């Protein structure tokens, strides 16, 4: 069992998003917000705090950044948000042919499951365009279908958002929300064909085991998908391993979708359900304003 799977990876509760309609730079916003927060904590103003130059920070702020380090990741990771956890490496760390776990960006929409029993995990394939409903254990996936290992690039659809003009809402990614790891699993096509796909199939959608940030178990965090033609392509995988090891919890242990060539938001983590649709999937965050 993956040693990462029982870790609670949420580090603190400080959001580092700047308002999209702000006229100040993100760095200036963060610096001023941090100074204001520290002033409130100590009960007095920080002398000349509003004049702190770019690149300079108060000692207390430096200690706060230390507390936001992510276990298993390089200390240079830039944490954009902590609930949900989103972080990226500085781009100069991404010069290796295969991106290692410790330098891979983290993009969450909800709270990852804290404990995972991989032996009991089930993936259910169903939907109005499925000929039947079938559930697979991970052991059954490994036994029934041919294994494939592919090196696939994943990139957040918001990568580079901090440079948008006019500014856009959301995590202010620089350009580190991209990775190129090796993924091992079975082709999504093989599993779908085993279940049976009706002629009217248009899309597939995924569901995962993460929890909504509100804590409401009835709310679906995110459920995106891809056209059925994309689902049937060779590089669309149901993966259980990354770089030759169990997928780390932060990246979707024990199962995730990997759909090469499409935004990483279509690569559902903690995968436990796939629906075959007779229309464009309409799950949460499938609309044009959600990415």
Which residue ranges define each predicted feature?
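N-terminal secretory signal peptides
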Residues: 1-28, 51-56
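Catalytic cores of secreted or luminal carbohydrate-active enzymes
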Residues: 254-291
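C-terminal segment of N-terminal export signals and the immediately downstream linker at the start
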Residues: 19-23, 44-99
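Acidic, His- and aromatic-enriched active-site or binding-groove loops in soluble protein domains
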Residues: 221-247
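Mid-length scaffold segments of soluble, non-membrane domains
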Residues: 177-184
């Amino acid at each position: 069992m993956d040693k990462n799977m029982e870790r609670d990876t949420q580090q603190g509760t400080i959001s580092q998003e700047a308002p999209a309609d702000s006229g100040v730079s993100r760095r200036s916003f963060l610096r001023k917000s941090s100074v204001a927060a520290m002033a409130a904590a100590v009960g007095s103003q920080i002398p000349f705090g509003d004049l702190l130059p770019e690149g300079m920070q108060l000692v207390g702020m430096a200690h706060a950044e230390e507390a936001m380090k992510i276990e298993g990741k390089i200390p240079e990771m830039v944490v954009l948000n902590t609930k949900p956890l989103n972080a990226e490496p500085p781009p100069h760390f991404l010069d290796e042919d295969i991106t290692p776990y410790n330098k891979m960006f983290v993009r969450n929409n909800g709270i990852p499951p804290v404990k995972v029993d991989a032996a009991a995990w089930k993936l259910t394939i169903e939907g109005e365009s499925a000929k039947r409903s079938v559930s697979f254990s991970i052991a059954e996936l490994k036994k029934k279908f041919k294994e494939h290992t592919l090196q696939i690039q994943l990139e957040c659809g918001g990568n580079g958002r901090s440079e948008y003009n006019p500014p856009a809402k959301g995590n202010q990614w620089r350009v580190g929300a991209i990775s190129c790891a090796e993924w091992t699993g079975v082709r999504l096509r093989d599993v779908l064909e085993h279940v049976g796909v009706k002629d009217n199939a248009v899309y597939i959608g995924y569901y995962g085991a993460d929890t909504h940030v509100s804590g409401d178990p009835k709310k679906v965090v995110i459920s995106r998908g891809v056209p059925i033609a994309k689902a049937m392509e060779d590089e669309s995988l149901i993966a259980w391993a990354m770089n030759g090891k169990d997928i780390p919890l932060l990246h979707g242990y024990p199962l995730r979708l990997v759909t090469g060539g499409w935004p990483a938001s279509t690569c559902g983590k903690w995968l436990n359900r796939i629906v075959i649709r007779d229309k464009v999937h309409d799950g949460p965050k499938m609309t044009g304003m959600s990415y």
